[in-house]
Amino acid sequence: MNKDDDKEGLAMFSALIDGIKPITQNKRHFRTPIKTKQEIELKEQQLHANSYFSDTYQPLLPVQGPMRWLEEGVDSLELKRLRRGDYQPDLLLDLHGYRQSEAKLELAALIQACVKQQSLCCCIMHGYGSGILKQQVPMWLVQHPMVKAFHQAPKEWGGDAALLVLIDIGEQPHRR
C-alpha cells in the first residue's frame, strides 16, 4: 500500500458516510450508580482509621513490664481488672498476617463494632512476629477517643501476644 491508495480509500470512506447523522438517545435514561451500605461503611472506616491513627505520634508507654495504658480520668482499678482478666472480651481481632494499613482499618472497625454492639471489652491479638504490629497497635489505641484503657492480656487470652482493650460505650452500666 502506498500513499495514493490510502488517499483513495479515505475518499471512498468519506463518500460513504457523508450525510450520516448520529442517533439521538431518547429511550434510555442512565442513572448514577447508588452506593451500597457496605461501600459507605467501608469509606467511613477508612476515614476514621486515617483521622484517628497517626504513625508519627509517639505516646509515653511503658518500656519494661507488661504493655498497659490508662486514659486520664479513668479509675486505676479498671486497669487492675483488665490485668486480672475480670473483663471477658466480647469481640476478638486477630491481626496475624496483616499489613499496617490493613490493621488500622480492622482496628477502627473493631472499635466501631464494640460501640455499636455495646461491648465493653475486646481482645486484639497482634502476635509476636517481627514486632511491628506489637509496637504500633498500642500507639494507635492511645490515639482513639473511645479507648479507655488497655493491658497485656492474661495467658488464656494470648498473653504478651495480645491486648485486652476497655472501650467507652457511653453511659451504660459496666458489665462483667
UniProtKB/Swiss-Prot annotation:
The keyword Transport does not apply. Pfam families: Smr. One of its GO terms (molecular function) is RNA endonuclease activity. It comes from the Bacteria. The keyword Transferase does not apply. Keywords: Endonuclease, Hydrolase, Nuclease, RNA-binding, rRNA-binding. Residues 93-168 form the Smr domain. SMART domains: SMR. Its EC number is 3.1.-.-. One of its GO terms (biological process) is rescue of stalled ribosome. InterPro entries: Smr_dom, Smr_dom_sf, SmrB-like. Acts as a ribosome collision sensor. Detects stalled/collided disomes (pairs of ribosomes where the leading ribosome is stalled and a second ribosome has collided with it) and endonucleolytically cleaves mRNA at the 5' boundary of the stalled ribosome. Stalled/collided disomes form a new interface (primarily via the 30S subunits) that binds SmrB. Cleaved mRNA becomes available for tmRNA ligation, leading to ribosomal subunit dissociation and rescue of stalled ribosomes. Associates with collided ribosomes, but not with correctly translating polysomes. Belongs to the SmrB family. This is Ribosome rescue factor SmrB. It comes from Shewanella baltica (strain OS155 / ATCC BAA-1091). The lineage of its organism: Bacteria, Pseudomonadati, Pseudomonadota, Gammaproteobacteria, Alteromonadales.
